[in-house]
């Protein structure tokens, strides 16, 4: 799931970096100290004072997107996810080891994914409110800090996260250790599109009843699993039960098949 962060950052490296450092945007301090909830509050207050401040609105959208990732990571931590054993979307997010995990169930994972989609919708709605075509947001991404354990310990910076996912450091880290990126209006549209894509992937998964066989599919990823009592697994695709097909399938199209192919997002 973390691939959007990688692509958002790497694809934006082509944006020019200015020699003189302008004042840091409001959002950056909260992204660096990991106090995303406080950052949302501060950004909303700034927008109350100046509703046309699209830099603050852009920063709020980024905070909300990053917070969505952190909330997903905290849920994965709660259930003791071993991300290196996962190939499925959303389960590959590296989180600290939890020695006392809760038991995961099909319904519990569904609630986690629904919450993630709701968080993404909030971020997308914020970004949709940006009207200034010349909006800029200059951020040093390296020190964006996640608290996946929810304890204040074992904090993970974005660079540490990217290094784990990449299997090593990126070449640009030597020349740009702060990972300075200047986002513009095109990145607003880009991030909105990714929020839509990830939400659609969640909807695609939730549109199909896959409770039977859930325990087999996540064994090795979660240490404690509650099986689906009384549900036999049907491996025949024609036996899949579509949930609320009239409402969901026209929206998500073929996104379930992307999930079935285990796209590494």
For each feature predicted by the language model, list its residue ranges.
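Residue-level recognition of tetratricopeptide repeat
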Residues: 53-56
């Amino acid at each position: 799931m973390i691939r959007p962060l990688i692509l958002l950052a790497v694809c934006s490296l082509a944006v020019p970096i200015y020699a003189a450092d302008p004042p840091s945007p409001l959002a950056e301090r909260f992204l660096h100290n990991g106090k995303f909830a406080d950052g949302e509050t501060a950004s909303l207050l700034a927008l109350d004072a100046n509703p046309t401040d699209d830099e603050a609105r852009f920063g709020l959208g980024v905070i909300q997107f990053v917070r969505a990732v952190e909330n997903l990571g905290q849920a994965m931590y709660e259930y003791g996810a071993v991300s290196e054993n996962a190939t499925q979307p959303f389960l590959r997010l590296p989180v600290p080891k939890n020695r006392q995990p809760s038991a995961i169930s099909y319904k519990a994972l569904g609630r986690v994914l629904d919450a993630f989609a709701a968080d993404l919708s909030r971020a997308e709605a914020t970004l949709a409110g940006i009207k200034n075509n010349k909006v800029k947001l200059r951020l040093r991404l390296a020190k964006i800090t996640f608290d996946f354990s929810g304890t204040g310990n074992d904090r993970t910076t974005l660079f540490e996260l990217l290094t784990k996912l990449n299997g090593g450091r990126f070449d640009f880290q030597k020349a740009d250790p702060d990972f300075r990126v200047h986002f513009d209006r095109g990145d607003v549209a880009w991030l909105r599109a990714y929020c839509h894509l990830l939400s659609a992937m969640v909807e695609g998964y939730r549109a199909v009843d896959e409770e039977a066989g859930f325990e087999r599919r996540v064994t090795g990823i979660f240490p404690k699993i509650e099986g689906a009592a009384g549900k036999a697994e049907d491996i025949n695709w024609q036996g899949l039960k579509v949930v609320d097909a009239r409402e969901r399938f026209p929206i998500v199209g073929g996104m379930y098949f992307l999930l079935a192919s285990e796209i590494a997002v």
